[in-house]
Amino acid sequence: MRNPKSFCVVAGFVRLPKSSLGQARYYSIPNDVSIPASKRKFIPSSGTYPKGFLVAGAHAGVKESNTQFPDVALICSETPCSAAAVFTTNKFQAAPVQVSKQVLEKRQGTGIRGVVINSGCANAVTGKGGLEDAKMMSAKVDECNGTPSTGPQDTSTLVMSTGVIGQRLPIKKILDAIPTAHSNLASTHSTWLATARAICTTDTFPKLLSRTFTLPSSPNRQYCLAGMTKGAGMIHPNMATLLGILCTDVPISPSALKALLTHAVSRSFNAISIDGDTSTNDTIALLANGAAGGEAIITTSSPDYAAMQTILTSFAQSLAQLVVRDGEGATKFITVRVCNSPSHADAKVIASTIARSPLVKTALYGKDANWGRILCAIGYAQGIAEGTVVPERTSVSFRPVDGSAELKLLVNGEPEAVDEERAARILQDEDLEIVVDLGGGQKGEKGLGGEEGLYWFCDFSHEYVTINGDYRT
């Protein structure tokens, strides 16, 4: 989400010498040609999608500069769903966030028919008029579904928007596009992929995943999970410029669904960072229509719940990681793993602090094994329990992607003699893992725990500054 006045279409950035993977950014993705070659490997060539869900995109022209490409998306279920969502913690919550919260609260997470999304305008900080626009979008989808609402407070469709902050939606264009999208609803892979494209802004590729699985109570029954997300900048925990829609055909109660989503998001979408900014619109929604049948997941104590929690969390992590891989100007994908912590929460705080550090991010862009910056970030992490970080027990290393031995940088608070040539080779790779061991490898020692926290982030490049300097903020 970007701030007021105009949306700047950025094209044709000059390639900077040190940036090998960053790409020019456009308002939306027009066709396959515009997708960078290095990113095409992340786009699925096929998929299996949950029963009873239909999707489509349509062109509304939310931005005047967009004369042909889809910028309105629909995800609809043929039957009412259980639904849960996690929203931005930003105090200036956009109109679609407020309306979606109202829909879920009014219906207590049941009877939801789908989601409508527009890209190009955030409908944030737009007052009562913006709220009415979001409600009209929800009501229009209900009308197309043949279940018109009895009033603006009784809709069954969630609403999401992404784009420029402080501008009103061209609501007539969007309301005209919704029936067009609805008439094209389908369940093919190409339609899912096109719908994922329709929600993009500065993304360089559409982010879509799907998978099949079974559950303990129905080992011979195939279930499906699909998800799409968008985001490339203003990404930081507790939701940033990030939209995500996950759908499954497993029957799940609203309370169990909420618990599943909360657990998964805390370990996925709330464990990524690109630039540390938290925005106004961000929403991750999970819909379950039960179309595949089988025993419903009602409580959090069942074997099916435990299995679904593992499946959903892993899936959400994979989806969230695609956002980091598309970070604005990014040349690296970094995993930071903090282990041997007394608590998962403290491990995650430390990992988050490292991921947010501009000095760490710029050092990695420069291929500099400057472990002092990592150590500094560990040392100033806020809100962790006393005794979590003990300098004499702390170790830091780089874990290469080729499976070779870790490059130890710091062991039990003492610096290692770093092989700079090997460090340079490791830092040439796109992927890197930083391991922070708070127990000096002494897992189980009194006062230490075995808890772990993971975080995913990217580096800061010259191109990040170029993109955001040219994009009205």
Swiss-Prot record:
- Site for Cleavage, residues: 240-241
**Principal place where this protein is found?**
mitochondrion
* EC numbers for this chain: 2.3.1.35, 2.3.1.1
Q: Which GO terms describe its molecular function?
A: glutamate N-acetyltransferase activity; L-glutamate N-acetyltransferase activity
Enzymatic reactions: N(2)-acetyl-L-ornithine + L-glutamate = N-acetyl-L-glutamate + L-ornithine; L-glutamate + acetyl-CoA = N-acetyl-L-glutamate + CoA + H(+)
Q: In which pathway does it act?
A: Amino-acid biosynthesis; L-arginine biosynthesis; L-ornithine and N-acetyl-L-glutamate from L-glutamate and N(2)-acetyl-L-ornithine (cyclic): step 1/1; Amino-acid biosynthesis; L-arginine biosynthesis; N(2)-acetyl-L-ornithine from L-glutamate: step 1/4
Q: Name one Pfam family in it.
A: ArgJ
**Site feature Involved in the stabilization of negative charge on the oxyanion by the formation of the oxyanion hole: at which residues?**
162-163
Main EC class the enzyme belongs to: transferase
Which Gene Ontology cellular component terms are annotated? mitochondrial matrix
Which top-level group of life is the source organism from?
Eukaryota
Key words, A-Z: Acyltransferase, Amino-acid biosynthesis, Arginine biosynthesis, Autocatalytic cleavage, Mitochondrion, Multifunctional enzyme, Transferase
- What are the binding positions for substrate in this chain? 201, 230, 241, 328, 468, 473
The answer to whether keyword Protein biosynthesis applies is no
**InterPro entries (alphabetical):** Arg_biosynth_ArgJ, ArgJ-like_dom_sf, ArgJ_beta_C
PTM comment text: The alpha and beta chains are autoproteolytically processed from a single precursor protein within the mitochondrion.
* Subunit description: Heterodimer of an alpha and a beta chain.
Q: Which PANTHER family match?
A: ARGININE BIOSYNTHESIS BIFUNCTIONAL PROTEIN ARGJ, ARGININE BIOSYNTHESIS BIFUNCTIONAL PROTEIN ARGJ, MITOCHONDRIAL
Please explain the role this protein plays, according to its UniProt record. Catalyzes two activities which are involved in the cyclic version of arginine biosynthesis: the synthesis of acetylglutamate from glutamate and acetyl-CoA, and of ornithine by transacetylation between acetylornithine and glutamate.
Q: What else is known?
A: This protein may be expected to contain an N-terminal transit peptide but none has been predicted.
Similarity remark? Belongs to the ArgJ family.
Question: Could you identify this protein by its name?
Answer: Arginine biosynthesis bifunctional protein ArgJ, mitochondrial
Q: Which organism is it from?
A: Ajellomyces capsulatus (strain G186AR / H82 / ATCC MYA-2454 / RMSCC 2432)
